[in-house]
Amino acid sequence: MTQPDPTPPIPIADDVGDPPWRVDGLADSVMILLTMAAVQRIAGFLRAILFCRWLDPEQLGQWDMAFSFLLLAAPLTVLALPGAFGRYVEHFRQRGQLRTFLRSTTLTCIGLLAAGTTVILLGRRWFSGLIFGTPDESGTVALLAVSLVAVVAYNFSIELFTALRNVRLVSVLQLVNSVAFAVIGLGLILGWRASAVSVVIAYGAACLIAALLAGWRLSGTWQSIRPAAEPLAARPFWARFAPFAGWLLMVNMLANLFEVIDRYMIVHYSTMPTSEALAQVGNYHSSRVIPMLMVTVAAMLGSMITPHLSHDWEAGRRREVGHRLALFLKLFGFALVLGSTAVLVASPLLFGWAFRGKFDGGLAVLPWTLTYCSWFAMVMIVQNYLWCAEKAYLCSVALGTGLVVNIGLNLLLLPPLGLLGAVLATTTANLVALGLICLFLARMGFPFDPGVRVVLGLPPVLCLGPWIAMSVLVVVAAEAALGKHLLTPEERDEIAAGARKYLGRLPGFHRVWTA
């Protein structure tokens, strides 16, 4: 039996209407995000290639471990409160209490960040051993603590404006961050020294620049938010917000541990000397340059569609949420595997010329890296259904189980197989997590039609080689276009309507579509 919600309902304001700031629709948001993300990803791709080209494997591995720490520490220090904006900004806006909501969460995040940064600075030798396997990098840890402030401010801004459905501004901020990181990082590497320290400084500076730009823009948005008609009591506010944020923190931590646990296992449990272990992490990093770009796009898309799906969910259109998310997963999942196949075709050129042949270990594990990153990207998309249903704890269960599998298999496979063992362990763990999330969704009524199931099972074909993978994709595409199982007629009509809408805006296409 469903338990009643102990939190008293907050009345919806009668005259809230549409927000006074610009709101982008879901279809427009996807096109804006994809366009800007394409430019951003090109900049990020070139930056990553040049980092791999000019940093030796050990320094590249040290930067990978430093970034992994920031990935874990950023949500942990603020208890993932900004991550819940996508679910609750619209909720409190409709009740005329958005200003109170933002003020409370902002002040809380500032206090938590100050405390977390202080702890890192005071314990920097211990953190150095944890991150790099040696206490001798305490100076780098101090730089990481300073950079953490800028990273949290940047992430806060991205989550807030995404929740406000201002996708144009979010895309601009992400582009500014990516370009600034590339320019400053490459400038420091070429003009100062080719080390992980240069990259850490550049990343912190890039996040600070984007956060300052967001703060300037937020000052105008704040004035357009009406003061609350009546105060929001702290107890009902936190009673509704805190449980979801708490489970979201667990999901974020488990998801981020998925991203870093194999590298930490390499550093601490591979039985290699520290320098050799970091060099293996550098090899691993080279194999993840393009796969992680795809995961980043998936995370952006997943974060972007959350407020739109939440809006439909709040309006009672829950069946529509499932069907929209299923179609999105089919299209994005197919694109993931298609892009991964192209990466395999181009991999000899990438590793032989662009990376100067320094990362043969990364080339050897590339098919497996592409496979598990594709599955992880799908997790970033489908978990939105659990978030809308306020069942974030089920994501925690799935990721926690996968994490245990990852650690256990790493302990078994890492000593005899080295880097390949770590990648195989992570691939299995991602499959376990995705399978559990799909099981939970099926029990909640998510539409797992044949098309969804086929897309979920596509990534392993990458391990059979690029030409076999391409042949499988051709068959799947033909069935989707002409058959009856992978796409329904309604879904094909929806895709065609979307194509006509956006291609019709291009010069020369309008006459074709209207003829």
Map each language-model feature to its residues.
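Transmembrane helical elements of multi-pass membrane transporters/channels
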Residues: D28-F45, N177, A202-A214, L218, ...
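Hydrophobic alpha-helical transmembrane segments
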Residues: S138-A142, S171-W222, G400-N406, L419-F440, ...
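Helix-loop junctions and terminal segments of transmembrane helices
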Residues: V78-Q94, A163, S287-L329, Q383-C388
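Membrane-proximal transmembrane or re-entrant/amphipathic helices at the cytosolic face
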Residues: T2-P19, G465-A515
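Membrane-interface junctions at transmembrane-helix termini in multi-pass inner-membrane proteins
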Residues: A150-Q174, P367-T401, R443
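Signature of the first transmembrane helix
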Residues: Q3-A13, R22-G83, A114-L121, S147, ...
